[in-house]
A protein has these predicted regions:
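Glycoside hydrolase catalytic-domain context in secreted enzymes
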Residues: 17-570
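Bacterial Sec-dependent N-terminal signal peptides
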Residues: 1-23
Length: 570
């Protein structure tokens, strides 16, 4: 009897405790976000708070393509980590993993705080099978903010179907050194254009329940020498009116919940430890209410690259006290607990950072977020409407630079043959931050022309040369092809890597800066050789950045810039 009474009392206590936990204020969606944040923050241990400021790489908790719960438990030690990324995962694998991790965080940790599942989606989700839209520089060339909104609305739907709640885009840098490899990621060199496109893209994400992260804050688009990690040198007036004007506009008008700090510096002061940028400007002057996230490894760079910190602990102090709330792909914030316990860091900075992260999670509905179902995946990812939108953007992004004697459009009924020549004539170029570089995942210009002309006329193709080598052995074939054709289309340009997959022969994109702006390899020599045949020539620039083509401008009657046009580019 006593045993029965004891068990009954234990059951009652458990039920009372469970009822109390499920009725915590932070779990009540009807309460103001501020109340929910403060209630949850008051219940968190120091370890739990710091975990919210850190992230997990998917590959570190997976085995044979699936979640290894033992690895996850060992890594997080029962704490709710704030973020997880799975950038290189195939789409359905990403959905499965993100759902499993999200469910684990909600159901098997003490407070059940959901995780921000994040990925890249600069011009489409980077997970296999997603729609590949035109690169940002192409979208900017449409001068159409409506298309910018429609594009991120479509991307957000695909991300949600893949279990993603936080996108590491859009890029709203103002690019003014065209040697920089990341020009392709930007909308352009005008702050007004970049601002309008940025506002539209942020709204497209937010209206479709995905949190965007504007980047790279701040002054990242004009590094010295065009080198990706180099400092940006400019006065405060130029900084505010050019490079940061886009961030001010987007923060005030579109109200994103996340900003990524860049890993470079302004006038040799690292952005990752700039109190002026992240606190005085972003929060005090512009009233930003969300959190600041570091670029990949940027906090550690304060130690080994910028040399402002002697070790990772100093780097953590510099970044956090300046206003950098969350750390990506580094372990500097693992030092925070010991720094607090040793009296070297006031815990108020941690509370402040965690409150901002939780504010974003509550506002984005993560605590009430239903896990996406796999049955919806194929209906959403690479949907026909998204593919059609990608084509529409590609069409509007084309720029006609030169059209002497109205050589364009071609009078197809007057032609018997067309020569299609060049290293990019039969090769897709999607741009950086994509999941593929393979022709099977897009339409090349040559393929599209074959479909367009059918049996109406003859297409003669020759590659001519590569993008980067000095090999001219293909010139003879290209010249022969040109001689037997009525008109020649020569497709030159650049190539970019696909994110974390294939970096071969890249001449553009992150980490692939150029020392000058002439076409790489012997591409211009190829154009000259084709021009020497006396046949009419049209040059198509299929690239992620502008190039200096003085000879081509002076001698070729038709010049078209296509940029990186996405999967429907042909």
């Amino acid at each position: 009897m006593k045993k029965l009474i004891f068990l009954s009392l234990m059951a009652i206590c458990f039920c009372v405790r469970l009822y109390a936990q499920t009725n915590f204020k932070y779990k009540n969606a009807s309460l103001p976000v501020e109340v929910r944040v403060q209630d949850l923050l008051s219940r968190m241990t120091l370890e739990e708070k710091i975990a919210q400021m850190r992230h997990i790489h998917a590959y570190s908790i997976m085995e044979n393509g699936k979640l290894n719960e033992e690895k996850l438990e060992k890594m997080i030690g029962g704490q709710n980590y704030g973020f997880i990324e799975g950038i290189t995962l195939p789409g359905k694998e990403c959905l499965t993993l993100m759902n499993e991790v999200q469910k684990y965080m909600r159901e098997k940790t003490r407070l059940g705080i959901p995780v921000f599942t994040l990925t890249e989606s600069l011009h489409g989700s980077v997970h296999d099978g997603s729609t590949i839209f035109p690169q940002a520089i192409a979208l900017g060339s449409t001068f159409n903010p409506i298309l910018a909104y429609e594009m991120t609305s479509a991307i957000a739907k695909e991300l949600s179907a893949q279990g993603i709640t936080q996108s590491l885009t859009p890029v709203i840098d103002v690019c003014r050194d065209l040697r920089w490899g990341r020009v392709e990621e930007c909308f352009g060199e005008d702050p007004f254009l970049v601002s309008r496109m940025g506002v539209s893209q942020v709204r497209g994400y937010l209206d479709n329940q995905v949190s965007p992260m504007i980047k790279h804050f701040g002054a990242h688009g004009t590094p010295q020498g065009g080198l990706n990690l180099a400092s940006v040198s400019c006065g405060q007036r130029e900084l505010l009116s050019i490079y940061l004007k886009t961030f001010e506009t987007v923060v005030k008008e579109a109200k994103p919940w996340a900003v990524m700090s860049s890993y470079n510096s302004w006038n040799n002061e690292p952005n990752s430890s700039s109190h002026y940028l992240m606190t005085e400007l972003l929060r005090d002057r512009w009233d930003f209410q969300g959190y600041v996230y570091s670029d990949w490894g940027a906090i550690g760079m304060l130690n080994y690259f910028h040399k402002t910190a002697q070790n990772s602990a100093e780097a953590a102090i510099q970044a956090l006290t300046a206003g950098l709330d969350a750390e990506a792909s580094d372990n500097s914030y693992a030092e925070l607990q010991q720094l607090v316990e040793n009296g070297m860091l006031d815990v108020k900075y941690i509370d402040q950072a965690v409150a901002r992260i939780l504010t974003a999670k509550f506002n984005m509905g993560l605590f009430e977020y239903p896990l996406p179902m796999e049955k919806n995946y194929d209906k959403v990812v690479h949907a026909p409407a998204h593919v059609s939108l990608a084509r529409k953007i590609a069409e509007e992004s084309i720029v006609l630079l030169q059209n002497e004697n109205n050589i364009l459009p071609l009078q197809m009924n007057k032609l018997k043959s067309i020569a299609v020549i060049g290293p990019n004539a039969d090769q897709v170029q999607f741009g950086d931050y994509t999941w593929s570089r393979d022709n099977k995942d897009g339409v090349t210009l040559l393929e599209a022309l074959k479909e367009r002309v059918g049996n109406q006329l003859t297409l003669n193709y020759a590659k001519g040369c590569d993008l980067v080598t000095d090999d001219r052995s293909g010139f003879k074939e290209a010249v022969d092809v040109a001689k037997k054709s009525d008109v020649c289309i020569v497709v030159v340009g650049s190539a970019s890597a696909s994110l974390a997959r294939d970096y071969s022969n890249a001449t553009c994109g992150e980490g692939f800066d150029l020392s000058d702006l002439t076409l790489t390899g012997v591409q211009e020599d190829l154009v000259e050789a084709i021009h020497a045949t006396g046949k009419p020539v049209i040059v198509v620039l299929l690239s992620g950045k502008p190039f200096a083509m003085s000879w081509i401008k002076e001698n070729i009657p038709g010049i078209v810039v296509q940029w990186y046009p996405g999967e429907q580019g042909g």
